[in-house]
Amino acid sequence: MWNNLVAAPVARFARRDGDDFRLPLGSAHLATATPQGFRETMGATIATSLKMPPGEAAFFANRLLVFFSSCDARRFGQWEHMSWRDFVHGHKRSHEFRALLSRTLTSLLVAAKEDMASARTIGNMGEQFLGNPLEIGNDGDLDRVLNGPTNDVWIDPWVALLRGLGVRFEIGAEVRGLEVRDKRISGARIVDGAGTARTVEADHFVVALPAERARTLWSPAIREIRPELAAMDELYTDWMNGIQFYLRTSPDIVAGHAAFIDSPWALTSISQNQLWTRKLPEFGDGTVADCLSVDISNWNTPGILYGKPAKECTPDEIARESWAQITTHLNDRGEVLREADLHSWFLDPGISWQAEQRRNANADPLLINTAGSWDSRPRSHGALENLFLAGDYVRTNIDLATMEGASESARGAVNALLDVTGSGAPRCRTFTLYRSPELEPLRQMDADRYARGEPNLFDADI
């Protein structure tokens, strides 16, 4: 898969009835060795790139400095329990500040409202995103995507590799429960695709399920042995699903991701043909020239066509509403997307319209890192010796519902299993997130200040 990742070199931030701006995502060289240098350089970059008033840009840069210079104890003890909006004082700032630096950051990263998302999670990710273009703490470009259809260039080769290693997939089987005996999992109750129930016995069990599915398996017996798993009931999920628009032409939008800042549904997109090795006209009957793949991050806010949130729209209404919100951003300075160019669309099959309830159901919700949710997240391994957890809800350094977070949790589960069995096999390589060494003295100072109950050195309005 690694060789099938390609860089998306530019991001576009589109405004409705306003000037868009494009942000190159290549390497940069910013003089940030000192706190003052960081504030000035980052503030100027934000003011220039986002057309933000210099005073507000400087204020946001200072909030980043507060977080980056915070010790671990403060990050977990203070910022984890604060929303991103409160951390950046979004309720006190201008509309532009709230739209770009408070609301958009959280909706794009974690599909959450800025008054819900943990400041620690958003700050951690901001720390990585800013380090990447400086070519520190990263192993590639800031924004990378697959160079072809996900199944073709990732899932199918991965499945073939695993099968070659002896893995057997039981497609259509559902886990209904876990049996406990002598403080160990003795079996998993499953129902196969034919409706036949049976119990699978094994030496070890790895539960690699999303949080909302995994917690249904935690019986009273399991919760008695691992009481911390009961806290998973407090974990919050919301929706972040997509729709694909197949086009007869390849519109010139941007060579990477586009964010539609003023869209009620917090839409983002990417035009895939420009990044794929095998071009779209080579698929099907050749009439499709491009695919505009769109993420819908806000399913709770009414749209501009029907006055309904996406959760209450039929599939056809979702398509029309998403298209309308995108075109109002792209066509306000000239026609970029034309109705005549739309060949067809395809909605995420995880979204299903429930006619009687007049709303959608979602088979694939997204874990949201709400303020304080770290305390409700378990580790990969605990008191049940042969039970191991893998999923983006497990405590990880990445700390975000992403493939990278899930991968890190899986590495932790495998390493724990190898430790329990006393295996001499090599352990999975693990990683830590980047932190600027230049700010380490400030973080050590902050540890002393936090222990004394004092605020961060830079935690003041400017």
What are these regions (language model features)?
Residues 1-63, 74:
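Dinucleotide-binding Rossmann-like beta1-alpha1 core, especially the glycine-rich loop
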Residues 14-16, 189-193:
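A generic structural motif
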Residues 48-69, 73-91, 95-108, 324-343, ...:
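Rossmann-like nucleotide/phosphate-binding core characteristic of flavoprotein oxidoreductases
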Residues 58-181:
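Active-site/ligand-binding neighborhood in enzyme catalytic cores
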Residues 82, 134-146, 189, 202-204, ...:
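C-terminal segments that line or cap access tunnels to active or ligand-binding sites in enzymes
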Residues 183-189:
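Short, hydrophobic/aromatic-rich segments at coil-to-beta transitions
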Residues 194-204:
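Core beta-strand elements of the Rossmann-like FAD/NAD(P) dinucleotide-binding domain
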Residues 416-462:
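Active-site-proximal substrate-binding core of FAD-dependent oxidoreductases
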